[in-house]
Structure formats: C-alpha cells, structure tokens
C-alpha cells in the first residue's frame, strides 16, 4: 500500500513539472522604442561600427552588422567600409536570461535601464514577473542602433528592440535574434519618437 502511495505521489510530481514546463510564457514579437528629432534622416553613405571598440573586426560583430546593413540598404543608405562616411551607425547587442514564470502570474515590476557608453540614450532593462512557479529560462536579446554624424557626434536617430525566446531553441541564438530585432527596429522607419510599441 505504501508503494502505491509513493507511485501516486511520483505521478503527481511529474504532472506538476510538466504543467510548469508548458506554462513558460515568452512575450511575442519585439518591444521597440525609437528617438529622433521629427525629420526623416537624409540617405547617403553610412558605416556600421560597434559601440564597443573591442568588437571591431570580429566575426561576431560582422553578423550583427550584416543584419543592420540589410535594413539600412532597404531604406536607401549605401553601407561603406572605413571611416570616410559622414554618417555612422553604432550598434550594440546585449543578451541575458531571466527565469520564466507561470503565465498566470500577471503582475510585474518594470526595472528601467539607463544610457549606454558614449551617451547613447537607448533605454534598456527587463521586466521580471512576480509570483508563479519557476519553469526554465528565457533568453532576452536587445539590439540598439544609433545613427549619428561622424563630424560632431550628433545623434540623427536612435532606437532599441528587445525580444525573448526560450533558452536552448534556435530562436534564442544571438545571430537569429538580432536578425529578427533588426527587422522590427527599422519597421516603419523612422517611427514615432519616444513611443514604445510591440512589433509582431
């Protein structure tokens, strides 16, 4: 009889674990915020450079730059190499994980971010739900791009896009995530300044 109780208890634990795994919630699409002065930037030659100089010339950054280049080319820019262009796109990619919570939670506290190096005013931060059971991890990827003049460093346009994926899935890979975020970030360019939207 005691073994029967143990078996029932084990079945219950397995069912509970399965229920938690199935309740992992990933926010769909990308959260996008853009900032600009209200005018549509003039197109021309532009170079794509990492916000972190240590990434310059790296294979990792070349994959991010390619995603941004595709979007800029679609919008009418001509991407060039080197430092001869007056316009430059500074690119930043950050990735972290958070514990996924049960879908029923429904209550969260937004942890606001700040500015990043070189006074790039792109907000960051994560929203961490409160309550609910642990059910794995979510990978959070953020892409930030700042278009500026090389001569004086003045910002022309800047924005950030943040998306989520379940850890261990192809969608959570950095390169794949940046590809999706670049499309979302430049959709409807230049976008409404100062407004955060969700692009699906």
Model-identified regions with their sequence ranges:
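C-terminal/domain-edge helix-coil "capping" segments
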Residues: 20-38, 131-200
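Envelope-exposed proteins and targeting segments
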Residues: 42-44, 64, 75, 85-89, ...
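Extracytoplasmic/secreted proteins, especially bacterial periplasmic and envelope-associated proteins
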Residues: 63, 67, 88, 176-184
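Structured segments of extracytoplasmic/periplasmic soluble domains
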Residues: 67-78, 96, 184-192
